[in-house]
């Protein structure tokens, strides 16, 4: 598996297993299967409503936590500093982990600046190993990066 080194030195698998549109009921089984065939990055999001299934599968897998790279994303209804801060802790609880490897802002809407401040704080506290954004166009990314202390380490984009 190819590894990418992020700007802060965190190593991330280049390829991962995404659980978008995987029902909460099926998520644990699907992630367990993905881990059993060698996937070591699992990509979920608050909006997918299946973080708990990811957490259960990783916990039950017997694979050391530091060998599984977990990505999640804060949904726009949780933007703003306080809501984002609370939602990060909720994701940690659902994923049954003390840290998330990469946490992203899911979309460039609403109070993304407040939400990103919450990411920065959780990153400094060690709750998040890396932070970034998802689905940001270049102008959104440049604007955000110009107004924060910790630059986004990832801009995850959907391609077909």
Which ranges hold each PLM region?
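CE4/NodB-like, metal-dependent polysaccharide N-deacetylase domain
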Residues: 84-105, 121-125, 147
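Acidic-and-aromatic substrate-binding clefts and catalytic sites of carbohydrate-active enzymes
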Residues: 22-25, 45-53, 77-82, 108-113, ...
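A short, structured active-site edge motif that brings together acidic residues
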Residues: 65-78, 101-108, 135-138, 156
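Beta/alpha (TIM)-barrel catalytic core signal, keyed to glycine-rich beta->alpha loops juxtaposed to Asp/Glu
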Residues: 107-160
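Conserved, mostly hydrophobic/aromatic
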Residues: 17, 34, 42, 54, ...
